[in-house]
Every structure is written in C-alpha cells, then in structure tokens.
UniProtKB/Swiss-Prot annotation:
It comes from Agrobacterium fabrum (strain C58 / ATCC 33970). CDD domains: Alkanesulfonate_monoxygenase. This is Pyrimidine monooxygenase RutA. HAMAP family: RutA. FMN binds at I49, K50, N115, E124, R140, Y141, S190. InterPro entries: Luciferase-like_dom, Luciferase-like_sf, Pyrimidine_monooxygenase_RutA, SsuD_RutA_monooxygenase.
Length: 363
C-alpha cells in the first residue's frame, strides 16, 4: 500500500480547533515535511489549492500558498518522492496547466502528477468575478471531462484540436511533452465524480470514515470498482486519513479530546453554509461529508487514534479493502507526525515491509 502526505499548504493543516497547533504555511515548513517524508520512504506528497478560507477565530485556511509553484520548489529539493499539485480548473486553462506540469516534470525528473478539482466553494471564485453561476454545480464534471481531454492530448501528443461545449482548441501546441507519466487524481465521490474518475483518473481520493473504523470507507471503494468495471480501466482509491499516534494510546486520545474541545465553531459553520449551496450534485459529495457535524473538527476525514501498534494494525486493515491503492495522511503536527510514523508506526505495518527493505538496502 502506498503512503502519501497531504502537506499543509493552508494554515493549521486540517484541524479547525483553537487547541490544535496554530501555524502559517511556508515553503520552509513544507520543504522540511516533504524531505522528512522522503527520508522515511513515503511514496508521494500532495498539496491542495484553496483560494478563500473559512474564517472563524482561527482564520482557518485564510492563509494559503499556491499549489503548482509550491510543488515546483519542492521538486528542486527532493529526489525520489512523487509530487502532486492541484489545479483549480475553473481559473487555470488546461494548456497552461499542461505547460506548468511539463516544467515541474523537468525539474523533478518525471515525478510530477496533477490533482484535478472542479471547485465547490463559490466565494473562492466569485471574489474574483470568475464564478460561472450555480448551474455549474450540475455540469461541472462535464466541464472537467472536456478539460481533461484537452490536458491529456497536450501532455501526450503536444497538440490539441479538441472541440466541445466548454473548450475549443485551434491547433493548440505544447512542447516538449513530459518525460514522465503525469498521473491524474480526482476526488469526486458523487455519481458523476465517480464516473469521471473511472474514465480519466489514475487515482481517486476518498475520505476515510469515522474514528478507528478503518474499513468503513469500503462502500466508496465498491462504488469506484463498479464504475471502473463499466469503463474498463483500473483506478486505485487513495484514502484521506488523519493519524494521531503516541507511545501510549491514552496520550493520543487525550490530544483528540483536547482538539475537539477547542473546535472553531464559526469556521465549521461557514463550511456547512457553503456545502449547502450545491443543490445539484446529490447527497454523496465530499463536501457534504466534510461538513457533517459528527467530526467537523477535522472535516470528517477518517481518523486513526492510538498507540503505534494500534495505528499500524488499523492501517494494515485499510490496505486489505479491495480497490485500495494507498492512504494520504495528515497529522496535527506534521513534522512530529511524519517522524513518529516513519520511526514507530511504519516498521510495524505488514503492508509497508517492502519499503523498509528498500530503505535498509539504500543505507
């Protein structure tokens, strides 16, 4: 099973809490995290794109770097780990994204991939006068399908004459093409999002579900497998998971309860209000899941809490769910979290023994 890190390009990472570590994003911080992840054999690092935050007392995600330029910098200082940047497709034309991806591919020696998002939070785009209207919620995956068709043509052939509803290319050229295979990731969990991933993506992100219920995301994998059976393509699921691991289980649980006690209710309320705007995509979207009040303090991503042994065992359980290709991990304190995972959790995981062997061989 692959393991990646969802690096904190936005302030405070993925905890909407006054009691969680408070920090602003910087290149130096993300460089240190990514280099540490590479040291411990993590397979990839991915950064999101967020153009407007949720506010609240913690000013959650009000401070953000830009994904592609951050990953370009990280490409220059890493050597093995795969890097994924996120394209906000509403404001980044596919020909420009293809050229930026080719540039980062050159910097990294073929280690770059793209996470494609449609955009769900209207204020991110309306603040710039670039929101296309709320009808977009209903046809955003049709838009993304055309976008990706253009992108793939440019990345593989260096030229596109694509003609569609949203995009019309006129002998659009983009050379050189990348040296590496630029993998595509999508995080859609609605029916249309799943269909898109099955047709175009190499990986599909899904949310882990619940606290210490490692296999609870299995129904999402089942839907993806059904969609790929129709498309005839293999697409692996990558599961978003927060890890709170300590030597003693009670210490990890004490952290979790402390973070929940300091939940930033104003920021959580903003998330809920924004998720309610989309009335066209159905009830199974990622943003609906994120805004569920059950565990909104970390946007309801699957959470594994316990001793190093307990967390390792739960991650191995996740690897056994059919269709799982990997996990993408977040932490409360990323530098400390990656260190503890690499030193104490990963060595106990059956699903990561191949990585330990590779690390030993490289010493």
């Amino acid at each position: 099973m692959e393991v990646g890190v969802f690096i904190p390009i936005g302030n405070n990472g993925w905890l909407l809490s006054e009691n969680a570590p408070q920090y602003k994003p910087s290149f130096d911080l993300n460089k240190a995290i990514t280099l540490k992840a590479e040291q411990y054999g993590f397979d990839f690092a991915l950064s999101m794109i967020k153009l407007r935050g949720f506010g609240g007392k913690t000013e959650f995600w009000d401070y953000n770097l830009e994904s592609f330029t951050l990953m370009a910098g990280l490409a220059a200082v890493t050597s093995k780990i795969k890097l994924f940047g996120t394209a906000a497709t509403l404001v980044m034309p596919p020909a420009i994204v293809a050229r930026m991806a080719t540039t980062i591919d050159s910097i990294s020696g073929g280690r770059f991939g793209i996470n494609l998002i449609t955009g769900w939070q209207r204020p991110e785009y309306s603040q710039m006068g670039l929101w296309p209207g709320d009808d977009y919620f209903g046809d955003r995956y049709e838009y993304l399908g055309e976008y990706t068709s253009v992108l793939k043509e440019l990345l593989t052939e260096g030229q596109s004459d694509f003609k569609g509803k949203f995009f019309q290319m006129d002998d659009c050229r983009m050379k050189p093409v990348p040296q590496g295979d630029v993998k595509l990731i999508c995080a859609g969990s609605s029916n249309s999002g799943m269909a898109f991933s099955a047709k175009f993506a190499d990986y599909s992100f899904c949310f882990g579900v619940g606290v210490n219920t490692p296999k609870a995301f299995a129904p999402t994998n089942e839907r993806l497998l059904a969609a790929t059976e129709k498309s005839g393509r293999e697409v692996k699921s990558v599961v978003l998971t927060m890890v709170l691991a300590e030597e003693k289980s009670e210490d990890a649980w004490a952290k979790w309860e402390h973070y929940k006690a300091g939940a930033d209710e104003d920021a959580i309320k903003w998330l809920g209000l924004q998720s309610a705007v989309d009335t066209k995509s159905g009830s199974d979207t990622n943003v609906r899941h994120m805004s569920n009040p059950v565990s909104a303090v970390n946007i309801n991503m699957g959470t594994l809490i316990g001793s190093y042994e307990e967390v390792a065992a739960m991650l191995d359980e996740m690897s056994e769910v059919p269709g799982t290709g990997g996990v993408m991990l977040t932490f409360d304190d990323f530098l400390e979290g990656v260190e503890k995972f690499g030193k104490y959790v990963q060595p106990l995981m059956k699903s990561r023994q191949h990585v330990l062997a590779e690390l030993e061989a490289a010493e």
